Regions:
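Catalytic center-proximal scaffold of phosphoryl-transfer enzymes
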Residues: 1-244
Length: 244
């Protein structure tokens, strides 16, 4: 795809990636090693989909973000949400490698392409946002592929912003799992999730984690319920730097 004209780009440059299961036709499915098939139910092969786009700023309060997630019409939303510009997509499967070389994970192939896109489209002073879920391999690939370009930018301009953001939709899914483990009634679950998401969006993620662990201890959770809360707490803790 051609590189967009700088004057047509938005104020922020966003790079995002996610793993996707791709259904295989029979001929391709037969090429998947037998030992690998159990991890790909339904004859699916994992690919990493990457997208680079630009967008103008859209300022919202934590309350507005949470109300949008809950589809709460009582909370007014800003009008005229800016549209993403020049969404460039590309997806990669893992490269099996040749001549005894190790396989190249799909996340690295995707981020290598995305790094080229970012380098070609970035404008002086334009903030770069890396937006993903908490999958460690994606963040490792982003760091490996984009770090040299970012370091060059920071040498030229120490004020250059590179912001890592954890996708709030994935955050909310972990909060819901914890809520269902802690409370039996739906209204209590909703109140818990709404409160914790608000606090996370206000930068209080470590306080949220501490409180969730305390409640789990007070309730004496065990088994799958304790596992759900512990998994959510670990997810939030491991990604706290991306939820500031």
């Amino acid at each position: 795809l051609p590189t967009p004209a700088p004057d047509d780009e938005g104020a922020i440059l966003v790079a995002t990636a996610d793993g996707k299961g791709v259904p295989l036709v029979r001929a391709d499915a037969q090429q998947v090693p037998a030992f690998d098939k159990k991890e790909r139910p339904g004859n699916r092969r994992m690919a990493t989909l990457g997208c680079v786009y630009s967008v103008d700023r859209f300022v919202r309060t934590p309350e507005q973000i949470v109300s949008a997630l809950f589809r709460d019409a009582a909370e007014s939303q800003p009008e005229d949400r800016p549209e993403a510009r020049f969404k460039h997509y590309r997806a990669f499967f893992a490269d099996a490698g040749e001549d005894g070389c190790d396989a190249v994970p799909s996340a690295y192939s995707t981020w290598a392409w995305m790094a080229e896109e970012v380098a070609a489209r970035h404008q002086s002073g334009q903030p770069i946002v890396r937006l993903m879920d908490g999958q460690l391999s994606l963040w490792d690939a982003a760091e490996a592929c984009l770090s040299d370009f970012v370091e060059t930018l920071l040498v030229a301009d120490p004020t250059q912003l590179v912001v890592d953001i954890l996708d709030i939709v994935h955050v909310s899914s972990y909060a819901w799992k914890a809520a269902k483990a802690l409370y039996g009634h739906k209204e209590h679950q909703e109140a818990f999730v709404e409160d914790r998401l608000l606090r996370i969006l206000r930068g209080e993620v470590l306080g949220v984690v501490k409180g969730m662990r305390r409640i789990a201890t007070q309730q004496g959770l065990k088994g799958e319920k304790l596992k759900a809360v512990t998994t959510a707490c670990n997810y939030f803790e491991n990604n706290a730097s991306r939820m500031r």
